Amino acid sequence: STVHGGVGARIACEVFGRSAGELLELATDDEIRSRSRAFLADTLAEISAVAAEADRPISDFATTFVGVVADESRVVTVQIGDGAAVAGLSDGLALIAKPMATEFVNVTRFLTDKDAEDRLVVEVFLQAANRICAFTDGLQPLIVDERTQEPHAPFFERVFSVLVGASEEPFDERASAWLSKMLSGDPVQKRTDDDTSIVVARRLP
């Protein structure tokens, strides 16, 4: 973690939230990748402004990033660094965002790195996704097979089942409370000492 990594992550999520819908309006993969690079530049500009105001180096705000946006025909992922995402596609569960490979163990890439644009990974899937789960690297060894890169179906089926009957509001208190209880339980906490953040979403009809 970094000194103000949480601030950097919040800024990245806010900028992505403002521009994510535009990705699905673009016709080609090249246009999507170009817009994703613009998202990176916009995020760095906002982080740089906050860092300058605080008189801190931008590296203090370093953060990894996994962003996913989907409609009835496509899924787009934008990623730099570790973390991953799984989606329920028309043909089953799929790992749609994979942790970035690095030369050394426990070393990752950050959105604030000088070569971040070169490290940015953008993927486009021509399928509908009705359920999406993004999570940090602390959960990955528990729910994704390291050798096959296959999602652990029982875990995701259980997690996605929480969305059944959830409200159509952006944030559902009941589902969030269930996830928090699950993540703080011994089956998870005894198997990882890293961050266990998770975001679960469904696409409304």
Give the role of each language-model region.
Residues 1-29:
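Primarily the active-site beta-strand->alpha-helix module of PP2C/PPM metal-dependent phosphatases
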Residues 25-86, 119-126, 189-193:
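Catalytic core of PPM/PP2C metal-dependent serine/threonine phosphatase domains
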Residues 61-62, 102-124:
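Active-site glycine-rich loop that binds ribose-phosphate moieties when present
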Residues 67-69, 79-81, 89, 98, ...:
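Short, structured patches in soluble enzyme cores that scaffold and shape functional sites
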Residues 87-88, 96, 109-112:
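Surface-exposed beta-loop interaction hotspot
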Residues 93-105:
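Flexible glycine-rich active-site/ligand-binding loops centered on an Asp-His dyad
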